Amino acid sequence: MKVIGVRFRKAGKIYFFDPLDMDIKQGMNVIVETARGVEYGFVVMGVRDVEEEKIVQPLKPVLRIATPEDDMIQNQNHEKEQAAFGICLEKIKKHGLDMKLIDSEYTFDNNKLLFYFTADGRIDFRELVKDLAAVFKTRIELRQIGVRDETKIMGGIGICGRSLCCHTYLSEFAPVSIKMAKEQNLSLNPTKISGVCGRLMCCLKNEEEAYEELNNKLPNVGDFVTTKDGLRGEVQSVSVLKQLVKVIVTLENDEKEVKEYHVTDLRFKPRRKRDHMQMDNELRQLELLEKKEGKSHLDDA
């Protein structure tokens, strides 16, 4: 089935649409109908064939390729969103609500105005919605998001010195666990493996597969191995990327010495799976927060 891939916000989720017979290419803007209404989207994937089982049905058609008039309306909407953000801030203050406004967004047809916010708990914003509806004369939706979504919208610089992955290119948040940091021999200090959002860094997922494969070729620290020169010893440390192993071997005079070998020069039993890890309370809380955060609520289009 032929489809195109469309995003509605930077680094947002990609949605499939039916291009019909239109000559739509990557980089174009299109007008499509979504569950939220008529939307203006950016084509990030040109026409291509996708297996039908991978498509969420019903597949909606592209209404049209965006015209200069559509581009102008979209720019006007962005200006209106900035004004709406300021008004909403004033209304939140007026109602004394303990919530942090993050972003505002108009649908292309102006039939709905969405406000994204964070808060520690549930917020009764019914009176606020009535107040906003009276001002903007359109449907109002207030959507509570998590700290990861907040960071995705706001952007920032990671400890690597680069723009945040979630703000730059990540469409969706992948599950991240402390085990990934452990596999990569990283410090388990929460301040070292947490991102700007205070959750585990998304980039821990990037090299998970490679480290898992490399680790499976190595013995565990504490395992006993036999070296190529016939010595038997205990593994002191391993270098995952270099595939080197430091072994405490016993020499003929019963003296002990630390020698370094490439993993191919050692014989040992297959690596034991060590899923159980000692975690302090801070790490455990970080892991629980990851599970509690759940999926993103930015792209419920």
Where are the regions that the model predicts?
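Short, basic/aromatic beta-hairpin or loop at an interaction surface
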Residues: 1-14, 193-206, 253
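Acidic-enriched and Gly/Ser
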Residues: 1-187
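Short beta-strand segments
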Residues: 13-15, 39-41, 231-233, 256-261
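A generic structural signal for residues embedded in beta-strands
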Residues: 32, 226-228
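Basic/aromatic-rich interaction segments and small domains that mediate binding to polyanionic partners
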Residues: 239-260
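Intrinsically disordered, low-complexity linker and terminal regions at domain boundaries
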Residues: 258-301
